C-alpha cells in the first residue's frame, strides 16, 4: 500500500561502503498516537536502497518491509515474520574500517609470498600434523592481523579464533622458518601507513610475533565478541598459485556481524575463474594493469543488516589506500532458471562429494559444468553475481570450522543471497570452533527459488547416497 504521510526528517551524512550516502531518520506520525521510525539511505544517484522501519505503537508488534527504487514512493508489505536488524546505523564502523585495511594488508603479504613460492621451489612449505601444507603466509597473516587488531582496538578488547597455532613455529628446529615469518611480518607492517594504519615504532622481534599468533586463542562460543580469522583459506590453491582467500569475521553473541573476504587472485573476468591458474598468470602478464585498471584481486565486506556488500580492488603497486578505495556494491545474480545457473564446489573431491552434487545438479536441471574453485572465493563468486550456487557435502564425520564460512556467509546474505545447511537452517556460529549441528551440507544460493529446489533434491536423494 502506498504510504502517504507528513514527516519530520533528520539527515545525517553516512558512509558504509563506496558511495556517499545520506542517512535519513524520519518520524512518521500515524493514527492512534503511534509513529514509525524510518531509517533510510539515499545514494548520490538519488536511489533509495535500504530502509528499516519500526512501528512504535502501543499493543503492536507489527513489522513492515519497505522496498523502493526511488526516494519518493514506498511499497509496504506486512512481513510479521521478517527479522529486522536492530543494529544502530554505523555500529561496528570502526571495526569494519580496520578489518578491511587489515585484510588489504594481508592480501598484499600473501601476493608477495605466493609470487616467491611460485618462482622458487617448495622449500617454504612445511607439513602440518594433518599433512596439509602450511606456508609462511599463514603464520605471517595471522600475526599481522592479530597485531593490527590489538594495536587499533586495544588488546584487551580483542579476542580472535584462528586456524594456526605456534607449536610448529616455536620448535627449536623451526628457527629458520620463524625468522622468515618475522621478516615477512615486519616487511608487511612497515607498509602499514599506505593502508592508513600505524606501523610499529620498531620492528617486531620473534617473541612479539609468536605472541601475536598465540593471542588468537579464543574458543568462540555463544557470548561476547570475537573475531574469526582464516589467514589463508584454501592453502592448496595458494601453494598451487591458484585461488585462495583471507577471511575475517566479527561474531557477537553467536551472530556474525561483520564479514571481510580478501580474494587476491579473483580475476577481473569471471570466465577466468575456471581457467587453470597457469593460463591466468600468462594472461595477467600479457595484460599488465594500467594505473586506471586492476587485473585481479578484491576485498569484499559487509555489515549485518546493512543490506549491502561492497567490493574494493586491492591496492596496486605503491599506491595508498584512500577509503573506500573505489568500492562498488556487489549483488547476487538474478538468475533463477537452473539451466542458466552456475554452481561452484571445492576442487578437491576429498572436501566435498563431486558425485553427490553431480546427481543433484542433474535432478534440478543444472546444465553447466561445475565451477571448481579453491577456498571461500566460491562465496565471493556468489556474492558478486558470477555464480548462483555453492554446495559443499563433506564426508560423514568431518566438522566444518567457523572461520571457513563466517565471512562468506554474511557477505552472501547481505548481497541478497541465501545460505543454510541442507536442512534449510542457518549455520550456527555460536557453538565454538565448529559449525555444530550442521545438517548434511552447506547450500548457498543467489535466490530462494534455487535454494528451495536444491534442498528438496537433497532430501529426495540423500538416503540413496553413500554419504
Ligand atoms: N576432509 C575435508 N572435508 C571438508 N573440508 C575440508 C576437509 N579438509 C579440509 N577442509 C577444509 O576445506 C578448506 C578448503 O576449502 P576448499 O576445499 O573449498 O578449497 C580448508 O581450508 P584451509 O585451506 O584453510 O585449511 C579446510 O578447512
Ligand atoms: Mg580454511
Regions found by a protein language model. Give the residues of each.
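Oxyanion/phosphate-interacting regions
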Residues: 2-107, 115, 275-295, 314-325, ...
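N-terminal assembly/interaction segments in proteins that build large macromolecular machines
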Residues: 123-225
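DPxDG-like acidic metal-binding loop motif
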Residues: 207-211, 222-296, 303
Amino acid at each position: 500500500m502506498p504510504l502517504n504521510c507528513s514527516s519530520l526528517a533528520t539527515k545525517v551524512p553516512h558512509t558504509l561502503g563506496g558511495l556517499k550516502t545520506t542517512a535519513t531518520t524520519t518520524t512518521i506520525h500515524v493514527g492512534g498516537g503511534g509513529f514509525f521510525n524510518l531509517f533510510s539511505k539515499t545514494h548520490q544517484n538519488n536511489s533509495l536502497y535500504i530502509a528499516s522501519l519500526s512501528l512504535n505503537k502501543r499493543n503492536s508488534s507489527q513489522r513492515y518491509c519497505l522496498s523502493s527504487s526511488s526516494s519518493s514512493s514506498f511499497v509496504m508489505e506486512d512481513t510479521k515474520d521478517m527479522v529486522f536488524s536492530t543494529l544502530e546505523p554505523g555500529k561496528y564502523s570502526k571495526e569494519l574500517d580496520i578489518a578491511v585495511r587489515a585484510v588489504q594488508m594481508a592480501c598484499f603479504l600473501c601476493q608477495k609470498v605466493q609470487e616467491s613460492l611460485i618462482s622458487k621451489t617448495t622449500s617454504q612449505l612445511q607439513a602440518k600434523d594433518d599433512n596439509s601444507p602450511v606456508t609462511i603466509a599463514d603464520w605471517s597473516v595471522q600475526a599481522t592481523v592479530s597485531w593490527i587488531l590489538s594495536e587499533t582496538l586495544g588488546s584487551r578488547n580483542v579476542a580472535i579464533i584462528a586456524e594456526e597455532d605456534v607449536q610448529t613455529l616455536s620448535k627449536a628446529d623451526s628457527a629458520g622458518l620463524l625468522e622468515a615469518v618475522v621478516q615477512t611480518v615486519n616487511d608487511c607492517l612497515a607498509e602499514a601507513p599506505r593502508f592508513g594504519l600505524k606501523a610499529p615504532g620498531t620492528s617486531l622481534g620473534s617473541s612479539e610475533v609468536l605472541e601475536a599468533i598465540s593471542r588468537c586463542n579464543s574458543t568462540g562460543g555463544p557470548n561476547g565478541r570475537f573475531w574469526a580469522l582464516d589467514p589463508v583459506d584454501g592453502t592448496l590453491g595458494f601453494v598451487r598459485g591458484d585461488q585462495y582467500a583471507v577471511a575475517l569475521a566479527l561474531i557477537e553473541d553467536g551472530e556474525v556481524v561483520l564479514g571481510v573476504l580478501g580474494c587476491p587472485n579473483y580475476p577481473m573476468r569471471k570466465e577466468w575463474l575456471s581457467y587453470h591458474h597457469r593460463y591466468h598468470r600468462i594472461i595477467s602478464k600479457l595484460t599488465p594493469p594500467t594505473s586506471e585498471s586492476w587485473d585481479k584481486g578484491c576485498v569484499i565486506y559487509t555489515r549485518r543488516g546493512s543490506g549491502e556488500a561492497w567490493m574494493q580492488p586491492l591496492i596496486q603497486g605503491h599506491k595508498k589506500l584512500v577509503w573506500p578505495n573505489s568500492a562498488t556494491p556487489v549483488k547476487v545474480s538474478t538468475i533463477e532458471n537452473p539451466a542458466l545457473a552456475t554452481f561452484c564446489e571445492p576442487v578437491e573431491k576429498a572436501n566435498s562429494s563431486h558425485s553427490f552434487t553431480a546427481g543433484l545438479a542433474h535432478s534440478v536441471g543444472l546444465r553447466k559444468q561445475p565451477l571448481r574453485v579453491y577456498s571461500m572465493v566460491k562465496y565471493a563468486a556468489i556474492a558478486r553475481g558470477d555464480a548462483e550456487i555453492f554446495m559443499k557435502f563433506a564426508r560423514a564425520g568431518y566438522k566444518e570450522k567457523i572461520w571457513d564460512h563466517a565471512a562468506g556467509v554474511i557477505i552472501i546474505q547481505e548481497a541478497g543471497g541465501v545460505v543454510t545447511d541442507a536442512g534449510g537452517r542457518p549455520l550456527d556460529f555460536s557453538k565454538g570452533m565448529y559449525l555444530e549441528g550442521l545438517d548434511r551440507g552447506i547450500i548457498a544460493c543467489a535466490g530462494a527459488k534455487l535454494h528451495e529446489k536444491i534442498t528438496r533434491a537433497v532430501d529426495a536423494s540423500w538416503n540413496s547416497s553413500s554419504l
